């Protein structure tokens, strides 16, 4: 039977461990979070969140940052855009346009910017104006390389065609992002 002193000491020890154990144990939820949702990444000092693309034709998204973690999702499209939301050592937490994702090794990612067409049928225009001539059309799911962006329009290249598309018709660029 425990004495009141031992019970109090056990309670204090349990509270201490609960409060500070996540700070010092690799692989815990705090360590795996990688960073806050916005700001600079703790590993690269690059902005978070930010867009990248899948360098490989296949990439495993894991439950946590490390090979010992279970694979939750497999990305199977080279050049698909992904959103990095956190960093931990050589791992990046990413998600696709549907919110699917997990932790992926940084060597499978590229800084080359791409976008996915989200509209059922997106029109590529000659210039960033709604009344400019349509040069091509792209179906939903088409992946294109991102070029210049204005507040509401981006120039993309896909399937040998180039043109300006409304930002609302693509995923892989921040709403107010401007690129030159």
Protein language model features and the residues they cover:
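Generic detector of solvent-exposed, compositionally biased contiguous segments
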Residues: 8, 16, 134-136
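SH3-family beta-barrel domains
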Residues: 29-63, 74-78, 85-88, 92-100, ...
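Intrinsically disordered, low-complexity polar regions and short flexible loop motifs
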Residues: 66
